[in-house]
Amino acid sequence: GLSVSPDGEYWYLSMAHGMPYGHLYKYKTGSDEMVDRVELGLFPATMGISNATGLLYIVNFNLHGSHSESSTVSIVDPDEMIEIDRVETGIMPHGSRLLNNGLKHYSVAMMSGILYEIDAMSMEVTRTLSTEPKMKSMSNHMGHNMKKMDHSKMNMGSNKKDSMAKMNHKMPAEKPTWVYPHPKDDRLYVVNNGTHNVVEVDVKKWEVIRTFKTDKGPYNCEVTNDGKYLVITYKSAAKTGVWDLSTGKEIAKFNNTRKVTHGVSISPDSRYAFVSVEGVGKEPGAVEVFDLKTLKPVAIAEIGKQAGGIAFWKMAD
């Protein structure tokens, strides 16, 4: 993951692989001089910085861990580069974004199918929500498949009971990978990679209110600062979609120049979307630029292999 400090003076990089733990690195913008690093949890990934607390919140994705073990969100003081707390959430947490007022942090647990809200001040989980679309959620709220579980051959007196329960636990089909707030802080957009949709969550009511059926494998998303458009990367389809939030319709879809579309960052003036594309094999990665006014691709820059996280630094004359 990548993030830039609110004052634009520093940028941060998560290094997922370690022995066994990963690290967060701090660099000076402009010179790219390394300033410091701090060890975090297993596979630290996406991060965000609060405008209210100034703290950095980063999910420990734990990609190589068990699909039954909950992981955490690390909270870091980016000035001192010290981890000050860890908040337990769900299995394989992904996405890490805060409201524009900086008071609430949101992440999703890919293998739990849950959206988590953390109070940025108290550093505690305050609410959780299934990322299932509304109608499905009513009939199967938490993804458990209890009716299909055969208990007849279980030895309830042995220590195998817990492991059997885990075996019969149904992994959520949604597999959420991203969450992003609307500029007005009244809506959240959650990407369900496994079921090919994005759900819109009302922050106050804390419920799913709209579902956008997307192309295959949506992965990341971002909303323009003017609140008009939602840009979604389709990792499996190798495409990028632009959605009009007033109508809930997709108004443009671009074929990316190579496979494995990854992240997106939008310019502060809401004009351009910058999309990272990983590529495969020996292929270089790329950043592709799309004009959100004309709805046309305008530029491409080839970069290192497997381009992933992307963040916007600044606009200059």
Cite the ranges covered by each PLM segment.
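Predominantly soluble domains enriched in secretory-pathway, periplasmic, or organellar proteins
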Residues: 1-317
